[in-house]
């Protein structure tokens, strides 16, 4: 085989290999594409999601509540939120001064040691035109929303937890 033929074959192999890499990269990019979006501040969707969880959090932590949104994801009719409740103006919430604490206080219990403060996660479902906070936890120390019972329905908004 001549040197020219070898160079041409090498060029064809290299071209094929480069095309293969492009196809694989595009396929991986598509397969791993994000399936959710974050509603922008001030949108009706974001407000509706905060309004859906607010009564639950106020029942446990008292009124009034503001949320620092750490993560908010929507995909179709499901959503996920990771929130940090606080009092207006950024005042932290003292768990010992909440309705939840007064309802559950036990001098023989150290349950406060097993909480992650007021950090709140919620899983939502849109029913007709209304967002409903179907599952939520305040102060959870585990990734409860990645349990097998939730993943089939909420995988699109928490794909990193639902493999």
What are these regions (language model features)?
Residues 70-119, 125-126:
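Mature extracytoplasmic domains of secretory-pathway proteins
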Residues 16-27:
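Bacterial N-terminal signal peptides
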Residues 64-72, 134-136:
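Surface-exposed patches in mature extracellular/periplasmic domains of secreted proteins
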Residues 29-33:
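Sec/Tat signal peptide C-region and signal peptidase I cleavage site
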Residues 35-64:
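Short, non-transmembrane alpha-helical segments in secretory-pathway proteins
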Residues 155-163:
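Short, low-complexity, Pro/Ser/Thr/Gly-rich segments in the mature regions of secreted, periplasmic
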Residues 1-14:
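N-terminal secretory signal peptides that target proteins for export/translocation
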Residues 119-154:
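Short beta-strand edge/turn micro-motifs at domain boundaries
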